[in-house]
Amino acid sequence: QDQKLIIKVFNNTNKPKIINNVHWININQINHSDKPHYLIAMSDANLFKKLSCKNNFLWSHSIQSVEKFIRKKQLLPFIKYKPIMILEGDYPYKSRNFFTSFYGKKILKIAVDDDFLNFNIDLNNIPKPNAIFTTKSDRNIKFLLDSWHEIKKKSLNAKLFINPPFNLSEKNIKDDINLRKKGDKNLLIQDLIKSRLFITPGHKTEVFCLAAEEAKELCLPIVTMGYGCLYERVNHGVTGFIAKNMREFIDYSLSILNDDNLYLELKKNLIKIKNLRNYENVKNDLINILDIKND
């Protein structure tokens, strides 16, 4: 007999609420008599202690070594509750240590918000030669700034916008490196569509890089070294470029900043793949991973 699917999320919400048929409950108000069919813990295997469930899944947002897993006191609950790992892409899947994914692992690619998916892109608009970096400022920022110093020499009108907090040096300011104003999602969208290039080396700790996916959804070409998951965000030569070294990183960036035709070609390719994945797709993929019968 079919039963209605009930979804409960336990977090730090101040008061219980129901949004789109999802129950939001403070984690300290868990009813321990609840017997869920499926239990998903976010990043911490110790959370499985809070409820009894036979079908456990551990959703990880990081690359964890065995040493870190032990240090965070996750090994014993991991062995006890036997969760299947949920990982957000090819890079974390391949990088996950066998001993921290012993009970299986599945890939669940996430998506960007509808505001990015539904934003209308003007194919013929050519922005000023602005580059933007909207991920955390500690992720290979020295590589980026050293590269930008060389880029600036051959693209005199180019500007680079990075996320705060970061202390700009006099050299950075001379290189037209600017701090973005942190604001809401609409401000981020405006900053991205006013840019011609999303530039990021990537970092070994990045397992999805939502910032790059948001830029791609707004049809912004990407230049990256492909570190971490960044190689998954770019189709080389079609939606951007994956450099093998700093020289290529600089040259690829210059080619997009200085060549209107190349920029428009990449943008045209990006528009073809716009709005291909949304949270309806994520939901369906999660249902398949959990093996829920959704008749």
Regions found by a protein language model. Name each.
Residues Y91-P92, I107-N118, F166-L168:
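Short beta-strand->alpha-helix junction loop in the catalytic core
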Residues E67-F69, Y81-K105, L117:
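A short, active-site helix/loop in glycosyltransferases that binds the activated sugar's phosphate group
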Residues K244, N261-D291:
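A charged, aromatic-enriched C-terminal amphipathic alpha-helix characteristic of glycosyltransferases
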Residues N11-K82, Y91:
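Extended catalytic core of nucleotide-activated donor transferases of GT-like folds
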Residues Y227-G237, F241-I242:
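Short acidic/histidine- and often glycine-rich active-site loop of Leloir-type glycosyltransferases
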Residues I189, A212-E217, Y231-E232:
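Short alpha-helical segment that forms part of, or immediately flanks, the ligand-binding pocket
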Residues D114, L123-K185:
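Conserved catalytic-core segment of nucleotide-activated headgroup transferases in glycan assembly
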Residues I193-V207, L220:
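Acidic donor-binding loop of glycosyltransferase active sites
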